[in-house]
Amino acid sequence: MSLSIDVTSLPSISSSIFKNESSSTTSTLSGKSIGRSEQYISPDAEAFNKYMLSKSPEDIGPSDSASNDPLTSFSIRSNAVKTNADAGVSMDSSTQSRPSSNVGCDQLDFSLTKGINVSANLDSCISISTDHKKEKSKKDKSRKYYPKIEADSDSEDYVLDDSDSDDGKCKNCKYKKKYFVLRMRMKQVAMQLIEDL
């Protein structure tokens, strides 16, 4: 994957700030890294205080000040920059010559002259190999396999004694076979319970 961006053909940006008030003063901000001059409107503290004190607190609204606090409003107005339609701020040309008249000029002029080239190759291989043993389900684990118990004590040929029958009436009973099958099953269950214990 390759990405190439060329920004050399972008136009440069140029604009200016012009000050047309003779009462403006010039101050240099030494705290900033950009050593250039900025011009502010010189505040008239007496006129502002007189204006604010002449109005009752109920009459002071948002249109009079950005804040109802006179000190805050004074600070805001003292740092306000007067601009016109050709406004701009200089970031580069601090040593640019200013007009001969008493008009301040700040210039913003920069152009992007660097090309950005991004090249990245994505090459990856994913191999997954697993040996999964089939786990028995919980039902299979809970199920126990018991050994089969053979019961050979009873058989179909077994004949009841007269003492076990009512006067020998059950010797040839039609339920005899079903009785012995049920008896054998019950015996197997009993033997299995004994083994489990």
Swiss-Prot record:
Subcellular compartments: Host cytoplasm
Pfam families to which the protein is assigned, alphabetical: Rota_NS26 (PF01525)
Keyword Metal-binding: yes
Sites bearing Phosphoserine, chain numbering: S67, S153, S155, S163, S165
UniProt keyword Transcription regulation present: no
PTM annotation, UniProt: O-glycosylated.
Ranges annotated as biased composition (Low complexity): 17-30
A GO MF term: ATP hydrolysis activity
GO cellular component, one term: host cell cytoplasm
Protein name as it appears in the record: Non-structural protein 5
Organism: Rotavirus A (strain RVA/Human/United Kingdom/ST3/1975/G4P2A[6]) (RV-A)
Upper classification of the organism: Viruses, Riboviria, Orthornavirae, Duplornaviricota, Resentoviricetes
